[in-house]
Amino acid sequence: MLPVRSACDLRCRFCFSASSISALERERVGWERLDIDGYYRFAKARGARRLVITGGGEPLLRPDDVLRLIEQGREHFDEITCFTNGTKLTPALARALTDAGLSYLCWSRHHWDDARSRALMGGGPTLAAFFEAAGELTVRATCVMATGFVEDRAGCGAYMDALRPFGVRQFTFKHTYTAFPESVFGGSDEDRWAAGHQVQDDPFAGEGEVLDRLPWGPEIRRIEECQVCFYREPTPAWELENRLCRSTNLMADGGVYASLEDRRSLLYRLASSPKRPSGSA
């Protein structure tokens, strides 16, 4: 779910949203008027196993929307997460996220060193400031790998070593995503930067115990006390061939898409919500 179309207070050099349908001009609708429960049922009936609140921008720019989506989502999903760059997280918001039903917070943090991370992301909190705000929230650290930054197994190890003292035991390292060749969104400054700084090979290949494997290949491993995954997106060609999409994506304008790169993948648009019974969450 992408409640924020494109607003963000940071400027990651590789920003995928700049090369996706999030970059299209579209009018945001008030999600409180939409049939969100109907969308949750639609997604779950088609195999969705977790609710992910992310965005073409920073979701916590709309904290009330995020909390409402989580509260409704816990009626449908056992696993709920939200991606954030951490700039808007406060101790009070962290507690509210926990109370609403968030399972864990995915923190987009792309280098272990504060200065190097700010150089790549255009800002962001220090490690110490973020974890002070996060409090007791379970945090899954998410790092996009890029040459010159976190680019190999040694860099991944240094990243994990820096975050483990703060209690982090879940790590996702992501390949440097670029738009697929036929995409109308290729050629953005961010896409060109990503293409020139690509890291595509799994730095953890052959290590640890494989706990699970996603249908298109990424493996979730246990390495010592940590859960680690090198994640790459499925290609649109793979999704078409296998008739399986990574996710359904509810956009800020109420459109539901099978792909964030193909505007032709619109599945439907949410209608207004029927009134929820008095006293319901």
Language model regions located:
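Canonical Radical SAM [4Fe-4S] cluster-binding loop centered on the CxxxCxxC motif
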Residues: 1-34
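Hydrophobic faces of well-ordered beta-strands that scaffold small-molecule active sites
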Residues: 2, 51-53, 80-82, 105-107, ...
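Canonical radical SAM enzyme core domain
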Residues: 22-38, 59-104, 108-126, 143-158, ...
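Radical SAM enzyme [4Fe-4S]-AdoMet core and its adjacent flexible, acidic
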Residues: 24-26, 115-240, 261
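Short Fe-S-cluster ligation motifs
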Residues: 35-56
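Non-catalytic positions within long, well-ordered alpha-helices that form the structural scaffold/packing
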Residues: 44, 98, 161-164
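Short, well-ordered coil/turn segments that N-cap beta-strands
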Residues: 47-50, 76-80, 101-103, 135-138, ...
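Flexible mid-to-C-terminal extensions adjoining Fe-S/redox cofactors in radical SAM and related proteins
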Residues: 236-281
